[in-house]
Structure formats: structure tokens, C-alpha cells
Swiss-Prot record:
A motif (LXXLL motif) lies at residues 449-453. Belongs to the GRAS family. DELLA subfamily. The gene is SLR1. This is DELLA protein SLR1. It comes from Oryza sativa subsp. japonica. PROSITE patterns: GRAS.
């Protein structure tokens, strides 16, 4: 029975024991052959790759490198991580020693469609923010989003072509390995110059990553899965921009420079989404904040800087009516104070190019009874190249006075600061003739007194010097703003509102001027506006980035100046309705002047844009004992 079973078993098994032994030997021989075929160098590293599969594995590794390299050349770290972030981090790759299968599984994951872009968060709350900073004035928390990536925003709603992972035949794949690869910026795809691939699948396990040719991009985009497109809402971005500026200023005030640095990096991206004046003023405030955060102060004045400052001042005079208004209203007050006087003396605390005085000289020349003898003392800072710029201004004014037959005398006083002036410097030279009429003095200051507030006691000394010469009138023109607050956040907020209105007026005035009189080719209309913006930008930088004696743009309001001058022994002089009417007429003649407003405030005149006063002119005299 046993033999029969064995025979039956043998016949049913299809072979004898000898045959089974030979099969076992063949299997062992095959395994040994496979072990001998494994690449020894990779085997030493723990990877089992047969020599016959080396070409296929090398091709797959090249494809994986190209696919992962498309994350962006401009920002390799963050961009590459963002591109392959959709790889399943929890995927278990069984037997990682099988390098060929492992790489192929990673390629299959890369070939999967990208996850959709999450929708933009609502304006009120941004869940993606990584830091929360309290807004200005304790008005709440501003949750600011991370800086927007320009590649994720578009204004044109068109299909976005995605990188295509397509299979290729072996011959094309072999040539692809020999060609030079290109890496382009984020959103573009890597391509091989000599490889050709189809959008359909192939029999080969190898694959290459390349951009679809132009003829097939439309079809590829149509077949690709829909990707949400983030469209920038300029109004929402504008709100976020203001929040970012205020939050950065608060972080600076709290000396949290890490948060301030993170916020200041978002401002240029948010400002780029805006247009017109908002973009420009935000750029200047962003630069000023960056200078303060990184402790990079503006360089000291040089020869080029001094000449450039004079050039900016001249362009600001031409582009907008603020300096014209200041000169006109001050001259009107001086002209009325000089009525009936035959010897007059004007002390100008900041003569610059002397643009204010030709109009006054002409008005005096047309006065009934003939012009008086006119003496002008111009005060200015020393020039870095040691040139006598003040004397050059005097020569030009003397030539003009000669043409209109006005007896004119000029003297220039070089002073690093107005606090260096003494009363005897402003008195007439030589002994006064007893038979001559005493000289009537007027002191004029246009945007000069606020600089003295950077030095303790300097303003009081200058006002004391002015009081000692007993002028008949003192004209003061200053910015109508409080940029001298001890709180940096309050000062920043006030200056942001002030200069935003100032930039709006430049935009509105230039557009109105272009409609009435379009500039000729190569004209200076655009240049005047650009240089005026730089003129204001330098003030912004000084208000925000500087502290201590370096911060000279310490503007104060009309009420604050009223208190300071009152304590120094001066009383206000009413400018009168005549000056108001003439100033309004001047603005009517200025192109684009519809938005400018002249207001009379407690005997003073202010010029502003719509409802916001921007500069104020006041007149003063020595108070009666």
C-alpha cells in the first residue's frame, strides 16, 4: 500500500525525486545568479539594484530630481518645500531597499493632481496669520496675513498650465538624460530640449517632466483639474496695508523688533496692490520703518545732499500751491505792516533761493508815494563746498530790484542753527542817523521754527532774540500737524494721515493741471510731481526713522504755536479778510485747485486739501507791556 501511494503520488506529482532535486538546484542557482547581478556599490549602501536595471533607476531618479526642482529658482528653500508639500508624509514604502519601486512610487505621487489653493480668508479675520499685534490706539487686534506671493495672485482669469508628468518611450528617455536641464521660476516647468513626450500613457515605466508644447498647452489646461485663482481685492489689501503699517509702528514702540521685521517685509507686497497716492505714501513709510527697524539712519548732509535739497524745494514750489500760499500770505501781512514806512528791513530765517521776495519788492514798487528803502537779511546754513550761496541769492535780488527802481540792500548771515543768532546781528549796521526815520523790522519764518524743537531751549532763545529787536510784525508759516508727540505710535499715525492727504493733493492737483494745460513732450510737469514726492518722502523718513537731535521735522499745530509764542511775549495779528480773498483768488488761478481750501481760523489762514488743513500762516507782534 505504501508503495502504491508513493507511485500514485509520484505520477500525480509529475516527476521523480531526482526531478525535484534538479528543480531545487535550478532555483538556488537562479537566486545565486540574482545575487551576483546586484550592483555591489549600491548593495553596500543597503539598496538592491540589479545591473540590468541601473539605466531604468537612473532615469527615474533624474525624473524625480527634475520634478522636485520645479519648486522655484528664486526661493529654493521655501518654494521647493511648497511644491512637494503634497507628497503623502504618512505613506509607508515597504522594503525601501528596493530602490526602483521606491522611486517609482514617489513619481506616481508627484503625478497626482495638486491640492486646491485654499480660498482667501475674510477681511475681518485671517486664520493664516502667525502673529497678532495690537493695532494703533488700542482699537483692537490686527491679524495680518503673511506676505502675499505674487505667483498666487492674478488679475487675468485664464487657465493655469500645470507641470505634466508624462511617460516616454525608452529611446526618448535615453536622449533626455544627455540633454541640458533648465530650472525656471515658480509656476513654470522644467523642459528637455530634445525629448518628446505625449500626454497619453506609454508602456515604458520611465517618465520625464516637461512642459507641454505651445500647441498643446490649451488642451492640457482644459484637461487639467480646475485650480482656484486668488484675485486681489484692492480695497481689502488697502485695509491690510494700513493695519500692517500701524502694527509695525506699535511693534517698534514696544521694541519688539522681531515682530516689526516680520511686518515690515509684508508692506512692499501689500503696497504693490495699491495704486496712485496710496502706493507711493506707503512705500515711503515702509522705507522709513525699515530704516528704523534695521537701525539704518539717513546719511549726514553732503554737498550733493544740500544741492539736491534745494532742487527738491524748487520743484515743490512749482508743483503745488503750498509754498506759493505761504509766501503770498506772509508778504501780504508784511506789506500791510510796512504801510507808510520809508525804511524797512526784513529778516528771513530761511531765504533759500529767495523766491519769496520778488513779489514783495514789486508790490512795494507800485505803492502810492513810491517804494521805501528796502533792506533784506537772509539767514542760511553753511555750504559744504564753502561757496557763498547766500551772496549769489543777494545778487539776483539786487538785479531785480534795480530793474523796478527799488533802493535795495542785502546781507547774508551764515548760521548752522537759528539759535546762533544774536540781537546785534539783526540791527542796522553803523550808527543810526538822528534825522532819518527809524527802520521798521519784519521777521519772516517759513517752515523753520519747528526745527528748533530738536534742541532744548533753542526755540526760546530765538524768540527772545526776535523780541529784543522789537519787530513790527513776525510772520510764521508751519505745517498744521502734530509730529512732535512723545509716543512714536501717535506720531506715526498722525504723520500717516497727514502725508496721505498731502500725496492725495499732489495727485489731484497734477491731474487737474494736466487737463487744463497738458505738458509738452519732455516737459517738467511730471518731474515736478515726482521731485515733490521725494521732497515729502525725506520728511517722512525724518519723522519716522530718526530720533533725538537728528529728528528735525517736529511739526506742531497752530494751537501749540499760539501757546509758545504767547509765552515768549507775542500777541497775534489778525490777517484780515483781504488776505483771505486774495489767497482764494490765487488758488482759483492754480490749475487743479478745486480740492484746495482756504480757511480763516482765529485770525490765521490755513490751506488744506478738502477738509484737512495742511499748512497755517499766522502773524505776530510784540505784546504791549
Amino acid at each position: 500500500m505504501k508503495r502504491e501511494y508513493q507511485e500514485a503520488g509520484g505520477s500525480s506529482g509529475g516527476g521523480s525525486s531526482a526531478d525535484m532535486g534538479s528543480c531545487k538546484d535550478k532555483v538556488m542557482a537562479g537566486a545565486a545568479g540574482e545575487e551576483e547581478d546586484v550592483d555591489e556599490l549600491l548593495a553596500a549602501l543597503g539598496y538592491k539594484v540589479r545591473s540590468s536595471d541601473m539605466a531604468d533607476v537612473a532615469q527615474k531618479l533624474e525624473q524625480l530630481e527634475m520634478a522636485m526642482g520645479m519648486g522655484g529658482v528664486s526661493a529654493p528653500g521655501a518654494a521647493d518645500d511648497g511644491f512637494v508639500s503634497h507628497l503623502a508624509t504618512d505613506t509607508v514604502h515597504y522594503n525601501p531597499s528596493d530602490l526602483s519601486s521606491w522611486v517609482e512610487s514617489m513619481l506616481s505621487e508627484l503625478n497626482a493632481p495638486l491640492p486646491p489653493i485654499p480660498p482667501a480668508p475674510p477681511a475681518a479675520r485671517h486664520a493664516s496669520t502667525s502673529s497678532t499685534v495690537t493695532g494703533g490706539g488700542g482699537s483692537g487686534f490686527f491679524e495680518l496675513p503673511a506676505a502675499a506671493d505674487s505667483s498666487s495672485s492674478t488679475y487675468a482669469l485664464r487657465p493655469i498650465s500645470l507641470p505634466v508628468v508624462a511617460t516616454a518611450d525608452p529611446s526618448a528617455a535615453d536622449s533626455a538624460r544627455d540633454t541640458k536641464r533648465m530650472r525656471t521660476g515658480g509656476g513654470s516647468t522644467s523642459s528637455s530640449s530634445s525629448s518628446s513626450s505625449s500626454l497619453g500613457g506609454g508602456a515604458s515605466r520611465g517618465s520625464v517632466v516637461e512642459a507641454a508644447p505651445p500647441a498643446t498647452q490649451g488642451a492640457a489646461a482644459a484637461n487639467a483639474p480646475a485650480v482656484p485663482v486668488v484675485v486681489v481685492d484692492t480695497q481689502e489689501a488697502g485695509i491690510r496695508l494700513v493695519h500692517a503699517l500701524l502694527a509695525c509702528a506699535e511693534a517698534v514702540q514696544q521694541e519688539n523688533f522681531a515682530a516689526a521685521e516680520a511686518l515690515v517685509k509684508q508692506i512692499p507686497t501689500l503696497a504693490a496692490s495699491q495704486g496712485g497716492a496710496m502706493r507711493k505714501v506707503a512705500a515711503y513709510f515702509g522705507e522709513a520703518l525699515a530704516r528704523r527697524v534695521y537701525r539704518f539712519r539717513p546719511a549726514d548732509s553732503t554737498l550733493l545732499d544740500a544741492a539736491f535739497a534745494d532742487l527738491l524745494h524748487a520743484h515743490f514750489y512749482e508743483s503745488c500751491p503750498y509754498l506759493k500760499f505761504a509766501h503770498f500770505t506772509a508778504n501780504q501781512a508784511i506789506l500791510e505792516a510796512f504801510a507808510g514806512c520809508h525804511r524797512v528791513h526784513v529778516v528771513d530765517f530761511g531765504i533759500k533761493q529767495g523766491m519769496q521776495w520778488p513779489a514783495l519788492l514789486q508790490a512795494l514798487a507800485l505803492r502810492p508815494g513810491g517804494p521805501p528803502s528796502f533792506r533784506l537779511t537772509g539767514v542760511g546754513p553753511p555750504q559744504p563746498d564753502e561757496t557763498d550761496a547766500l551772496q549769489q541769492v543777494g545778487w539776483k535780488l539786487a538785479q531785480f530790484a534795480h530793474t523796478i527802481r527799488v533802493d535795495f540792500q542785502y546781507r547774508g548771515l551764515v548760521a548752522a542753527t537759528l539759535a546762533d543768532l544774536e540781537p546785534f546781528m539783526l540791527q542796522p549796521e553803523g550808527e543810526a542817523d538822528a534825522n532819518e526815520e527809524p527802520e521798521v523790522i519784519a521777521v519772516n519764518s517759513v517752515f523753520e521754527l519747528h526745527r528748533l524743537l530738536a534742541q532744548p531751549g533753542a526755540l526760546e532763545k530765538v524768540l527772545g532774540t526776535v523780541h529784543a529787536v522789537r519787530p513790527r510784525i513776525v510772520t510764521v508759516v508751519e505745517q498744521e500737524a502734530n509730529h512732535n508727540s512723545g509716543s512714536f505710535l501717535d506720531r506715526f499715525t498722525e504723520s500717516l494721515h497727514y502725508y496721505s492727504t498731502m500725496f492725495d493733493s499732489l495727485e489731484g492737483g497734477s491731474s487737474g493741471q494736466a487737463e487744463l494745460s497738458p505738458p509738452a513732450a519732455g516737459g517738467g510737469g511730471g518731474t515736478d510731481q515726482v521731485m515733490s514726492e521725494v521732497y515729502l518722502g525725506r520728511q517722512i523718513c525724518n519723522v519716522v526713522a530718526c530720533e533725538g537731535a537728528e529728528r528735525t521735522e517736529r511739526h506742531e499745530t497752530l494751537g501749540q504755536w499760539r501757546n509758545r509764542l504767547g509765552r515768549a511775549g507775542f500777541e497775534p495779528v489778525h490777517l484780515g479778510s483781504n488776505a483771505y480773498k486774495q489767497a482764494s483768488t490765487l488758488l482759483a488761478l492754480f490749475a487743479g485747485g478745486d480740492g484746495y481750501r482756504v480757511e480763516e481760523k482765529e485770525g490765521c489762514l490755513t490751506l488744506g486739501w478738502h477738509t484737512r488743513p495742511l499748512i497755517a500762516t499766522s502773524a505776530w507782534r510784540v505784546a504791549a507791556a
